[in-house]
């Protein structure tokens, strides 16, 4: 299964960061520093777990989408990409 939307989202994130538009949530988050980006990823991960335990499937999907977005921002902030994660997953499947 391929999820092309993640690659597109990764490109949007990269572009928003390059544009340095202070009205962009993505740019503001990125500019706030790695500590804040990592904290946001942690918050979103907890929200996915809470949704899985106490809320419906729709809520889990919504929170998982938030987590994936914030994880892509974190990867970009560290100079990594979705391709790096995919390569690691492929290695683990051998």
UniProtKB/Swiss-Prot annotation:
Pfam families (UniProt xref): PRA-PH
Catalytic activity: 1-(5-phospho-beta-D-ribosyl)-ATP + H2O = 1-(5-phospho-beta-D-ribosyl)-5'-AMP + diphosphate + H(+)
GO cellular component, one term: cytoplasm
One of the GO BP terms on file: L-histidine biosynthetic process
GO molecular function, one term: phosphoribosyl-ATP diphosphatase activity
Keywords from the UniProt entry: Amino-acid biosynthesis, ATP-binding, Cytoplasm, Histidine biosynthesis, Hydrolase, Nucleotide-binding
CDD domains reported in the protein's UniProt record: NTP-PPase_HisIE_like
Keyword set includes Hydrolase: yes
Source organism superkingdom: Archaea
Pathway: Amino-acid biosynthesis; L-histidine biosynthesis; L-histidine from 5-phospho-alpha-D-ribose 1-diphosphate: step 2/9
Cited InterPro entries: HisE, PRib-ATP_PPHydrolase-like
Compartment(s): Cytoplasm
Leading EC class: hydrolase
Keyword Protein transport: no
Main location: cytoplasm
UniProt EC number: 3.6.1.31
Family: Belongs to the PRA-PH family.
The protein's name: Phosphoribosyl-ATP pyrophosphatase
Species of the source: Pyrobaculum neutrophilum (strain DSM 2338 / JCM 9278 / NBRC 100436 / V24Sta) (Thermoproteus neutrophilus)
Encoding gene (name): hisE
């Amino acid at each position: 299964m391929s999820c092309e939307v993640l690659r597109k989202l990764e490109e949007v994130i990269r572009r928003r960061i390059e544009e340095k538009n202070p009205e962009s949530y993505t740019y503001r988050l990125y500019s706030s520093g790695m500590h804040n980006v990592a904290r946001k990823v942690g918050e979103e991960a907890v929200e996915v777990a809470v949704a899985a335990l106490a809320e419906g499937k729709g809520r889990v999907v919504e929170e998982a989408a938030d987590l994936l977005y914030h994880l892509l921002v974190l990867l970009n902030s560290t100079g990594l990409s979705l391709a790096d994660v995919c390569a690691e997953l492929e290695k683990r499947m051998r």
